[in-house]
Amino acid sequence: MKKLFLLIGLIAVLASCRSTRTISNAVTKKDTTTKVPAVALVDTQQLIRQALRQVDANRIDYTTFSAKVAIDYKGTEGKEYGVNANIKMIRDSAIWISANAILGIEAMRVLVTKDSVKLLNKLEKVYTARSISFLQEVTSLPLNLATLQEMIIGNPVYLDSNIVRYTNGNGVIGLMSLGVYFKNLLMLNETDKRILQSKLDDANPMHNRTADLLYSNYETKKGELFATRREIAVSEKGRLEIKLDFKNYSFDEPVEFPFSVPKNYQRN
């Protein structure tokens, strides 16, 4: 894909006049011409490269991750739910989620691998097994295991190297990338390049799919900059809203994924 190179800056103004020397009584006339210094051009591509390097440096590098999360969920049908969940991950391998309903009763257990999504509905005693494409069906986003893990951990998603616009103002850097699925407007804190927002618009103008991801309440643990609050809104035919509040979390500690299907569960 052809890159569009944008240049932001001022054109250097060069003003100079060649002084005319006149010799009168062996006295040289002083050159009174004012020379305006050249204004340095801003290399936008260099600024983009610097920002992307810092974004890459801020990526959380982990082997395992576990967290307790308060989740507020509003589905496309307008119903709202609030649950507490335990999330465990092994990078590039699996995601395990246990969601509790009222009174701390476990309502759902989920296991996501590279090729499948398995769900245990413990309230209704139903077991569901689907292919990984099920993630896209329920979220309207092109999700696989790796992308979902990046979203949970707080790393940038759908960020393409094809940066078509760069902005900087009010302490916020904006990088607009054009990828296969989305135009992604990534908003960064100017100082440390932490992610503030990622606004996604479908790259296909025939589709009306948008998503907005907000990151806030950053903490530093074991050298990793982690956003403890997230807001995700996805709109297509309906609107899906998810808020995540990470209460406790840890990196690179042993994790287990207990997942067994009782014999009396209905298979779906």
Show where each model-derived region lies.
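Flexible, processing/modification-adjacent segments and terminal tails
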Residues: K122-N184, V261-R267
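Positively charged n-region of N-terminal signal peptides that target proteins for export
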Residues: M1-L4
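N-terminal leader/targeting segments and the immediate start of mature chains
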Residues: R18-A70, T76-E80, Q266-N268
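An acidic-aromatic
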Residues: T22, A94-L145
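Gly/Pro-enriched, hydrophobic low-complexity segments
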Residues: S19, I23, R165-N268
